[in-house]
């Protein structure tokens, strides 16, 4: 069981475009993460994904959780934010679900890329109630970290490099992870052109 290595100080980690937010190590603040997110992040760290230890979390007012509002309020760069969109389609009566991660400056190409990946005729956004119930996360806080293993996890190649501000599973906080962490999530598929 290896020693966890954390940055000496948070000033060692520079996140371009973070604005006035001051996050802290996520593994030291598990109360700010939804249970499935805690499990997934801890598992990554135990697996030796070094960058999992660099994941950061910051508490925010739930009223400011929406990307556009948060970006304005904290003077953040919109390109730092990545959204997790849940999409579903059916094939031979079987529902197929994908969690799609794209930069906030783009939209998930549901009608072409996602549909093809899921191998379904028609793909559409998952209803809010189902998304919340199945993920164990709060609406507005749904994140790729800790989604059910039966779902496809599609990550736009633009999110596989640099930092992303993503949900924590809760509306009252945000998670900051590197592209390496997203790529190391179980079942993660890096997809060119997912975000358009």
Sequence positions of predicted segments:
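Extended, low-hydrophobicity, polar/charged segments
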Residues: 6, 10-196
